């Protein structure tokens, strides 16, 4: 088994999907969390100046979704067929496109709040409806078993609900999917013991 070291801030953020995958696959790793004050010094040492990074036996991987695909490759989390794998990637990318619209690093609080409000008020409802329609009456987003797309939905929606608690009031099927992911023993155990952070 390779030695894994995950480096990210002390928050869920873009590293949480990697942590869920490690938990589900029962893979041991070092969860190295850095403070904002240490970031400038660390940033200058990274090939692309961004985290999370995953060190695998000393070799550095970057980009959270690329890391997630690397870890889930040849596992049931990736999807059971090539077509399912494409659908998994499409749902993950759809969610990530939306999450990337938010000005997470904006320093002007009034500008940040206005943009968040617009996205949550006008854009989020359309995405929730699209996801609800896509899920339909199925148990999971893709195929007949859980994939990392379901994990990513739970992670992204947890963050969105911090800012818009009524986000899923009209989408009980999406709420049920969240609860199903949270009830998976390995995921439930991780959620229970992880550091509690806002984001």
UniProtKB/Swiss-Prot annotation:
Q: What EC designation does it have? A: 5.3.99.2, 2.5.1.18
Q: Does the keyword Magnesium apply?
A: yes
- Annotated keywords: Calcium, Cytoplasm, Fatty acid biosynthesis, Fatty acid metabolism, Isomerase, Lipid biosynthesis, Lipid metabolism, Magnesium, Metal-binding, Prostaglandin biosynthesis, Prostaglandin metabolism, Transferase
State the reactions this protein catalyses: prostaglandin H2 = prostaglandin D2; RX + glutathione = an S-substituted glutathione + a halide anion + H(+); 2-glyceryl-prostaglandin H2 = 2-glyceryl-prostaglandin D2
Compartments reported by the entry:
Cytoplasm
GST N-terminal domain residues: 2-79
A biological-process GO annotation: signal transduction
Claim: Lipid biosynthesis is one of the keywords in the record: yes
Choose one Gene Ontology CC annotation of this protein and give it. Answer: cytoplasm
Annotated glutathione binding lies at 8, 14, 39, 49-51, 63-64
Superkingdom of source = Eukaryota
Predominant location: cytoplasm
Report quaternary structure and partners: Homodimer.
Q: Which family does it belong to?
A: Belongs to the GST superfamily. Sigma family.
Task of the protein: Bifunctional enzyme which catalyzes both the conversion of PGH2 to PGD2, a prostaglandin involved in smooth muscle contraction/relaxation and a potent inhibitor of platelet aggregation, and the conjugation of glutathione with a wide range of aryl halides and organic isothiocyanates. Also exhibits low glutathione-peroxidase activity towards cumene hydroperoxide.
What name goes with this protein? Answer: Hematopoietic prostaglandin D synthase
Protein species of origin: Homo sapiens
Q: Which gene encodes it?
A: HPGDS
């Amino acid at each position: 088994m390779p030695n894994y070291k995950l480096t990210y801030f002390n928050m869920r953020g873009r590293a949480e999907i990697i942590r869920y995958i490690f938990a589900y696959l029962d893979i041991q790793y070092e969860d190295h969390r850095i403070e904002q004050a240490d970031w400038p010094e660390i940033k200058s040492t990274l090939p692309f100046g961004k985290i999370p990074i995953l060190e695998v036996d000393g070799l550095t991987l970057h980009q959270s979704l690329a890391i997630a695909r690397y870890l889930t490759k040849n596992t049931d989390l990736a999807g059971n067929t090539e077509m399912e794998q494409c659908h998994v990637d499409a749902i993950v990318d759809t969610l990530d496109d939306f999450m990337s619209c938010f000005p997470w690093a904006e320093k002007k609080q009034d500008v940040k709040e206005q943009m968040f409000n617009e996205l949550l008020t006008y854009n989020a409802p359309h995405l929730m409806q699209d996801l609800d329609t896509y899920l339909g009456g199925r148990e999971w987003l893709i195929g007949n078993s859980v994939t990392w797309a379901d994990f990513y939905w739970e992670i992204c929606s947890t963050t969105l609900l911090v800012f818009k608690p009524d986000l899923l009031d009209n989408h009980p099927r999406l709420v049920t999917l969240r609860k199903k992911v949270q009830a998976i023993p390995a995921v439930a155990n991780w959620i229970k013991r992880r550091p509690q952070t806002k984001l």
